[in-house]
Design a protein with these regions (language model features):
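Conserved N-terminal phosphate-binding loop of PLP-dependent enzymes in the Aspartate aminotransferase
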Residues: 2-395
Length: 395
């Protein structure tokens, strides 16, 4: 480790609030599926900035579009129309099948917006409903609103009491959800594929059961696609693979390929009775730079047919992880779908991720015992082979 790297880490540690357990590496630039540190060491990235960098690094088409927009206009406010926001919203409508879009700056903000939209719908309908049912081991963000529907006690405990009116059901257990329904239940919120909770994929029975329950009881269904959306699991959004449609959804991360942007979307029926002028807002959301990133990302996705690519590479990744499981006693299960997969292990996650870093592989944990694989969606089979080779050595 060179003097510059040590000095930069020292400077950073003395200036920033210590909210992250950072690895001892200073990243400098990236190309394709690889990142490089300040010493020139190359890392195969199977973390993608927590499933954000879907197009990898150094995509010239995206970069040129962003540079051009920076030279033109990158912020005004939502008091005025701009030439980019409307197109980005139409693009998201098209790929989600939803009717109304609200742009945010992050996934946590998007989730907060879905909760407010659901509460306002109930208020305007005069139902008196205000309660939410969320899932145990879920993760929806760290703001008070998003944290209130996050079902992981260590994240919640230091900040309680949080927003009242939230109860937690067992994931993939429809009876557990039904037992919590009251005449005050406003919405049920869930991730179709839990990321932080340990790469837990919803069953078809569970997703369709939730949709049916919501329809029968007059409850709204909210799908959080912040991590599992935007092609990550082999469909543009994971809920689409179940043949259902939520009333409201959140998205972020990969929709901007690394530019901070999120959004929540809803059907026209919900929008008619939901947020109005004065109910919700954002200073930066929907700015021209972020919206350029959204539209260009979608354009590249469709041009490269990345959803089909993820289906192919996801199947290959599953095959190779199953082979790894058969060879390594410490691997107990292969989980997930598409390019959002994981292996359940008996070794400490911190030990595995640190050793992988030394070998030039970036991976992250999920839950207490799962190694998560969320690489850029542009990877090829040789990248999977390289990852498996390194991981096998580490394990």
């Amino acid at each position: 480790m060179n003097e510059y790297m040590n000095e930069y880490m020292k400077e950073t540690n003395e200036a920033l609030l210590h909210t992250y357990n950072q690895f001892p590496v200073v990243l400098d630039h990236g190309e394709g599926a690889y990142l490089y540190d300040t010493e020139g060491k190359k890392y195969l990235d199977f973390a993608a900035g927590y499933a954000v960098s879907s197009l990898g690094y150094g995509n010239q088409e995206l970069n040129e579009a962003l540079k051009a927009q920076i030279d033109k206009l990158f912020h005004t406010s939502n008091l005025y129309y701009n030439t980019v926001c409307g197109k980005a919203a139409e693009d998201l409508k098209r790929i989600t099948g939803m009717d109304r879009i609200f742009f945010t700056n992050s996934g946590g903000e998007a989730v907060k917006g879905t909760l407010k939209a659901a509460r306002k719908y109930a208020y305007k309908k005069g139902t008196g409903r205000y309660e939410f049912i969320a899932m145990k081991e879920s993760f929806h963000g760290r703001s008070f609103g998003a944290l209130s529907v996050t079902g992981h006690d260590p994240y919640r405990a230091p900040f309680e009491p949080l927003v009242p009116g939230v109860s937690f059901a067992e994931y993939n257990d429809l009876d557990s959800v039904k037992a919590l329904v009251t005449d005050k239940t406003c919405a049920i919120i869930l991730e179709p594929l839990q990321g932080e909770g340990g790469i837990n994929l919803a069953t078809e029975e569970f997703m369709k059961g939730i949709r049916k329950l919501c329809d029968e009881e007059g409850i709204l269904m909210i799908c959080d696609e912040v991590q599992c959306g935007m092609g990550r699991t082999g469909s543009m959004f994971t809920w689409q693979s179940y043949g259902i449609r939520p009333d409201i959804m959140s998205m972020a991360k990969a929709i901007g390929s690394g530019i901070p942007v999120g959004a929540f979307a809803m059907t026209e029926e919900i929008a008619k009775y939901s947020l109005e002028p004065g109910d919700h807002g954002t200073t930066y959301g929907g700015n021209p730079l972020a919206c350029t990133a959204v539209s260009k990302t979608i354009e590249i996705f469709e041009k490269k047919n990345l959803v089909a690519h993820v289906q192919e590479l996801g199947a290959y990744l599953t095959e190779k992880l199953e082979e790894l499981k058969s060879e390594c006693d410490c691997v107990k299960a292969v989980k997930g779908k598409g390019l959002m997969q994981g292996i359940q292990v008996t070794k400490p996650l911190s030990e595995i991720t640190k050793e992988a870093l030394k070998e030039g592989l970036l991976i992250i944990g999920a839950g207490n015992d799962v190694i998560r694989f969320v690489p850029p969606l542009i990877i090829e089979k040789e990248h999977v082979d390289e990852m498996i080779r390194i991981l096998k050595k580490v394990l």
